[in-house]
Amino acid sequence: MTGSFHDEMIAILPRLRVQALSLTRNRAAADDLVQDAVCNALAAQHSFTPGTNFSAWMHRILRNRFISDLRKKRETGNIEDVPASAMAGSGAHEERLVVKELAEAMNRLPADQREALVLVVMQGMSYDELAAATGCAVGTAKSRVFRARRQLATWLYGEERDLSTVELRGAVQRLRARVGEPVAASF
């Protein structure tokens, strides 16, 4: 493994874990998914063209691995298991309820919208990067994020409006500060 490839791989691991958590909604499954995606990337390292978007390449590998695993698991069971530890945290009961409500709302979003929202809002991906990582058109990526924001606003505030990236990031940061745990891990 070349130094640059290795450095990029190490740097992207936290963002891959966030994406994996948004897809699997389970910490152990997310860790397994990231590990499998890294193994796949190492095996396919020769196919990566230096100078191209490494982040999009890795997110695509992770997403494809998730889809493959999902197809295999479809025959044996459902992956909709959310461990109680995903909702646990330190802080007042009310604050935990707010985090739980946000996590439940995120979990109710369709997988493609949840993934798009996490990658754009939490990880700061551009719409172009999101489109490349998920294999969809830029317009589709934008509409997924828009629909996810609007649906969250409806569920959380009881009104149909769009949550801006700034509002959503601010809400997540306030929740993180109150509870003292990474909110993205709850998704």
Short names for language-model regions:
Residues 4, 133, 150-187:
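C-terminal edge and immediately downstream basic/flexible tail or linker adjoining helix-turn-helix-like DNA-binding
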Residues 1-18, 28-31, 42, 54:
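A short, charge-rich alpha-helical start-of-domain segment used by transcription regulators
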Residues 107, 111, 123-140, 154:
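Helix-turn-helix DNA-binding module
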Residues 68, 76-102, 126, 168-182:
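Internal acidic/polar
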Residues 49, 60-81, 95, 147, ...:
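Arg/Lys-rich amphipathic alpha helix in sigma70-family domain 2
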Residues 32-39, 43, 52-64:
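Structural recognition of an alpha-helix C-terminal capping motif at a helix-to-coil junction
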Residues 8, 12, 16, 20, ...:
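Residue-level preference for hydrophobic side chains embedded in well-ordered alpha helices
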